[in-house]
Design a protein with these regions (language model features):
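Conserved donor-binding loop and adjoining core beta-sheet/short helix segment
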Residues: 45-82
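Acyl-donor binding region in acyl/amide transferases
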Residues: 69-118
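Active-site rim helix/loop that mediates acceptor-substrate recognition in acyltransferases
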Residues: 29-49
Length: 120
């Protein structure tokens, strides 16, 4: 059994960042039937999902607690690939801070080809 862990105190002004990120994440959501835009927004509001925003990109993550370890899951991303790649060290530090031992991510074949050299 796995569960998402609420770790964010969500004190930053997420709504302003969400206005920018929403169209990028909406595009990514076209490839899943597990979530819709309202689900993602609610997850951010409740601190279950974490919103990462760059100048041209956005990413949504969540921390999942499995029986034997914690992992950070890269749920959705959109925008500039190089900028998203540059976010990974910060996400790794964040994950380590919360005791995560793994980083997971999935996606379309195009993303998977790009992420494979990074160890995904």
């Amino acid at each position: 059994m796995q569960k998402a862990i609420k770790k964010s105190n969500n004190k930053f002004k997420w709504k302003e960042k969400w206005i920018f990120a929403k169209p990028l994440i909406k595009e990514a959501l076209k490839h899943t039937d597990c979530y819709n835009l309202e689900d993602v927004e609610e997850g951010i509001r409740n601190g279950i999902f974490h919103l990462w925003v760059g100048e041209k990109s956005a990413m949504i993550t969540e921390i999942i607690e499995y029986p034997r370890l914690k992992a950070i899951n890269l749920l959705f991303c959109g925008g500039d690939y190089k900028e998203l790649q540059s976010m990974l060290p910060s996400i790794e530090q964040f994950a380590k801070h919360f005791g995560c031992k793994r980083i997971y991510g999935g996606g379309r074949k195009g993303w998977l080809r790009k992420l494979k050299p990074l160890g995904f």
